[in-house]
């Protein structure tokens, strides 16, 4: 008896994978000029198509709202005029970045006479699985183009209209630059089986990059048969040290928590050294109270915040110290030392982004060395943990793993190094 034919979804994904693999060969050989031309064309297409993008995004927002999608997801789904402008600007910034492909480093002559070094090359094909944020479509496309990779993108069903409209712009930009249209492809189905196939096609896909909820990322990490660049959540800490400038500490802590609640680099936990707690906590507590931020407190912190008018105070549970809220909620605890702060961050944090606010340079340097996170900051908001802010032009994700790529993943995170050898007829003896 013959084996059954592949399901339509598997057949579809195999076609996308085969096309991406073929396109990746052309992209690896593409000139910097052609790649930059595609990126600049994409920026023009985004600006020219802003009204259409807004209209398609409104369709997605209407469906999401009627379906009762969680508020943070709806917030991530929204394409505001500012977001559309930033997408175009991001393409231009990526075009302006140096092309990493073909860069050779660490060239050295060996006693045998050969010269050995390393060359930066594209990974090949990456698969992207993401929820809500349709701007990720442009981030992924722009970085794929500049890094000489091909990409297969599978956005969330809630953003289908937005992503389809954006992908049409990408295809036009690739064509204008003479690059293969299959270099960036959008999975044209909301069938979840497509994700299962995408993460299990090592013959076509070299790496998977998931962006979304913890459940999605855990599933992909468990089921993928290709490498995964990932982070599970963002329990980011701000630690106010005994040596903090309190005006700075109030300003930075406020921004880290309230500038936007839904991103994974927003602060979720606040640690305060006992020596400055009485002076600092009522001030930041008043800021949080004015903005409706719920404070889940340890007992010492709660006592110092009790007199703040309008403060929403809740006794913290053990679960709160590790929670990513993505909402106007923050956990607050007093600590007795820098050692305790570092230990708590490494125990309860998610190895994403953590900040120390201090004027004590030795303490700052200890924090940088000993906090085991992908991004560690001194006197700056955790909200800066972003490829755009780090000068990467755009980011395709953030990795909290310790191999290959760590932190915001930009162009170099989509490349690898291969060994190259130059000789003049040397043979091994």
Swiss-Prot record:
InterPro entries: Ald_DH/histidinol_DH, Ald_DH_C, Ald_DH_N, Aldehyde_DH_dom, Glu-5-SA_DH, GPR_dom. Keywords: Amino-acid biosynthesis, Cytoplasm, NADP, Oxidoreductase, Proline biosynthesis. GO terms for cellular component: cytoplasm. Pfam families: Aldedh. GO terms for biological process: L-proline biosynthetic process. Its EC number is 1.2.1.41. The keyword Transmembrane does not apply. PANTHER family: DELTA-1-PYRROLINE-5-CARBOXYLATE SYNTHASE, GLUTAMATE SEMIALDEHYDE DEHYDROGENASE. HAMAP family: ProA (MF_00412). This is Gamma-glutamyl phosphate reductase. It comes from Methylibium petroleiphilum (strain ATCC BAA-1232 / LMG 22953 / PM1).
